[in-house]
Structure formats: C-alpha cells, structure tokens
Design a protein with these regions (language model features):
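Alpha-helical membrane-anchoring segments
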Residues: 1-331
Length: 331
C-alpha cells in the first residue's frame, strides 16, 4: 500500500512539475518582439485601408450604420452578446477622423515598439472597438490580428527590436527607478513572456482543431475535391490553378493532407520530431491561400502566428547573423 501511495505521489508531483515548467519557465521575448512588429504593421495596414473610405465603414452613413451595427449585438435580431463599442455612438465625421487618426498613431507606435507597455494595450483595445463596430465586414484576418495583439500586450514585446530598446540603451547609464524599468524593460527571460507564448500557442491549436473539425463535416473534404473547388472558384481566384483539373490524384492528396494536418496540428506541433514538418506544412498551406485565393493578409498573419512555436533563442541567433552580414556588406 505504501509503495502504491508513493507511486501515485511521484506521478502527481511529476505532473505538477511539468505543469509549472510549461507555464512558468522564463522565456526570452525575441520571438514575441518579431510578432509585435508583424502584428503592428498589419494592424496599421488595416486601419489605413479603412481610412481610404472611412465614412463607408463608420458613422450613420456607413454601409452598416450605427443603429444597425448596435442591433446586431444587443439582441434585436437574435441573441444578445458582449460585443460592445463606443463607436456606435459617434456620428460626427470630424470626431471619427480624429479618433481614427489617434488609432493610426497608436498602432504605428506599437509596431515601432515606442512606449509599448502603453501602446500595446491601447492598440488591442482600439482594434476590439473597431471589431465590434464593423460586424458584417470582418474576416479571419481581423480575428487573428486581435487575438495576437491581446496576448502581445501581456508580455514585454517591446523589450527588443524596438524604439523602447534603443531608448533604454541610450540612457543605460542612468537609473531612473521602477517606473522607468517597467516602461522600458530589459530583453531578458521572463515568466510573462512564457505565459503569453503558451496562450498564443494554445489559441492557435484551438483554431486549427475546430477549423479541421468544421471541414470534416463537408463531403468535399472526404471525396478529395475541396481543394479543387477552392482554386477554381472565380470569386476568390487570384492565381489560375485550373490546370489541377488534369491531375485529380494531386488535388485529392492535397485535400486529404490538409484535412489531416489541420485536425492533428494540436497534437503534432508539440513534439520536436514532428514540429518542423507541421510548421512547414502550415507555411505551404497559408502561402497557397495567400497566392491562389487572394487572401494575402490572412495568409501572412497565419504564417506569422505559427512563428510562436519557433524558439526565441533561434530567432535571436538569426537576427544576430543578419546584422553581422549587413555590417560586413556595408564595410
């Protein structure tokens, strides 16, 4: 009995240790900082696109006006949800432009890594307000941007490859207190960086799992024609791939491989043995979506999201090598 108790105790302690190691082992922020740059640039691009015809998206004269947008969330047309935004109540074009200019400025600072501790939560909050207002004009690109911005604000994503890092180095000789150290954190391993990384990894696994299960409900994913129907659809087609019609075994294999990969991504991405193959396939799939189906921004963001499984030490090594090569070329 004592031996059995010891075995159970050892197993439980091992489980607790593994849990602690998974969540609370300090991690370098370098991969998160690269993701901050990509997410910030794509957020900036998204807001600049809105600025090309702002009145068509926001205000009382928009395609979906303020009142209709509010009713889509408050239960008028169905179940009420928690999607709320103050943009429902702004009708003045001047105020909307001032607000949008502020949003663009904040997003640009977030991308550059300027006052990231402040601009990262602001960029996420403003994006969420737009997300709740623009019901009916959203796509997966917007959702991926929002969840990545949400987790990046939890971590010191501006501690390297940023204006914040330059400012900290520039004034390194002066000890300015706790607030300064919080505002301009060092590029060192932290628990928060690891927690943000794990949350992003798990979120991505959930996205792929439910995406794969949803695909499995469709007959075309079982009979092998889903990829063909996708690339032959003129509504999305940006690259003529109709030549695949002459190779049914090819597009059938592509269909079944994609379905298998998406459903089992959440299991196969964790072991080091299978991770390179899973990530490589993710790049191939999303690059194909970007080039063949015209969803370039979505493809870029999904490839970027998969970077969260790349070791920050490896990212740091690559950046250092690129800098050295650049310096050698300049010399």
């Amino acid at each position: 009995m004592n031996q059995s108790d010891n075995l159970v105790k050892t197993w439980l302690l091992g489980y607790v240790d593994a849990w602690d190691q998974f969540w609370f082992t300090p991690r370098l922020p370098h991969a998160l900082s690269i993701l901050r740059i990509i997410t910030g640039v794509m957020l900036l691009y998204s807001h600049l696109v809105l600025a090309t015809d702002l009145s068509a998206f926001l205000g009382d004269t928009a395609w979906v006006n303020n009142e209709t947008a509010r009713q889509l969330h408050d239960g008028t047309f169905g179940l009420s949800d928690y999607g709320r935004t103050y943009l429902w109540f702004i009708s003045s074009p001047t105020l909307l432009w001032i607000h949008h200019g502020f949003t663009i400025a904040v997003t640009a600072c977030f991308a550059l890594g300027l006052l990231t501790r402040i601009t990262s939560p602001l960029a996420w909050f403003l994006q969420l307000m737009y997300l709740h207002r623009l019901t009916g004009t959203l796509f997966g690109f917007d959702q991926i941007l929002t969840y990545m911005a949400m987790y990046l604000m939890l971590a010191p994503s501006g501690s390297c490859y940023s204006v914040d890092a330059w400012l900290r180095k520039r004034f390194a000789s002066t000890d300015r207190g706790r607030f300064w150290n919080w505002l301009f954190p060092e590029a060192k391993a932290t628990v928060l960086a690891n927690i943000a990384t794990r949350l992003m990894q798990l979120h991505l696994c959930v996205i792929y799992l439910f995406g794969g299960i949803s695909k499995a409900r469709g007959q075309t994913w079982w009979d092998g024609t889903a990829v063909w129907y996708s690339v032959s659809n003129y509504e999305y087609q940006s690259l003529d791939m109709t030549w695949l019609s002459g190779y049914p075994r090819v597009f059938s294999a592509m269909t079944h491989i994609t379905l298998f990969w998406e459903i089992f991504y959440c299991a196969l991405v964790w072991p080091r043995l299978t991770r390179p193959f899973v990530i490589t396939l993710a790049v191939v799939v999303h690059a194909g979506i970007a080039l063949a189906l015209g969803m370039i921004t979505f493809g870029i963001m999904m490839i970027a999201a998969n970077m969260i499984f790349i070791s920050p030490g490896w990212v740091q090594h690559i950046v250092v090598r690129l800098r050295r090569r650049s310096q050698q070329d300049d010399g």
